[in-house]
Amino acid sequence: MGTLKAVANPRASRRAFFGVAALVFVASAALTVAGCVSMQTMSELPMPGGWSMSMTWAPMCGQKWPRVAATFVGMWMVMMVAMMLPSLAPVLWRYHEAMGEAGSMRAGRMTALAGVGYFSVWAVLGVIVFVLGVALMSLALRVPSMARAVPIAAACVVLLAGILQFSRWKSRYLACGRMLTATHSASKAWTGGMRLGVHCILCCAGLTAVLLVNGTMDLRAMACVTLAITAERLAPFPDRIVRVTGAIVVVKGLWMLLQAS
């Protein structure tokens, strides 16, 4: 009886863990879709060079910059939860199991702290992306020659992102992004999650750049990047997935370069 109970508890804990993860994923995905649909109803500003600037980077009538920034970072975080959780959940579960007390409340708290630490790093990245995006768009509005160069610059970014997939940088941080050291210290759980978040950001730098170039509110781009990130983390042969993704992104970059020129 004791053995059956020991087996049943981890199974019940596993179901509960992935059930909660699935609910969080569905909620964040639904909010992301709603946000994208809302943004798509807003007109874009035509720019020299044949592209259009999204209103994501500009305040609407009566809005103040702090509110614009808070809205962007909020949408960014909801989007990142939806995109990263499918590949993060197995890592967090292994961390939960490694605590040696899979059914305990303490293991759950440590796992939650690690997850919050992980996404806090993505929140900081969201702030950086917003500041850089506003600065670049403001410069493009003031300097027409720079606005005309944006399509070529975007194509080069995508091309470099594809090449990055074949680098040792990618292999190194892809391996680091699968590990989270178990600890019974709340502060170390938080910092461990943050460290994992940094590794994931560095690992996904190229794919994140592709997403930003194609539009942060583009559902198709989000879906493709999410599938690529999840596949390269969970597939039995991640190196093959990384190379295939890299080849696709390189072709995309060359096509964009051809169109821009």
What are the residue ranges of the model-derived segments?
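Histidine-/acidic- and/or cysteine-rich, low-complexity loops and terminal segments associated
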Residues: 1-77, 101, 137-146, 168-184, ...
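Juxtamembrane transmembrane-helix termini in multi-pass membrane transport proteins
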Residues: 2-9, 72-119
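Residues within membrane-spanning alpha-helices of integral membrane proteins
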Residues: 18-25, 151-158, 162, 222, ...
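Small-residue-enriched transmembrane helix starts and helix-helix packing motifs
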Residues: 62-81, 154-158, 186-198
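Generic transmembrane alpha-helix signature in multi-pass membrane proteins
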Residues: 78, 90, 94, 192-198, ...
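A small-residue-rich subset of transmembrane alpha-helices
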Residues: 104-135, 203-252
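Transmembrane alpha-helix/helix-exit interface in multi-pass inner-membrane proteins
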Residues: 123-138, 142-143, 150-177
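A mid-sequence, solvent-exposed acidic-amphipathic segment
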Residues: 168-206
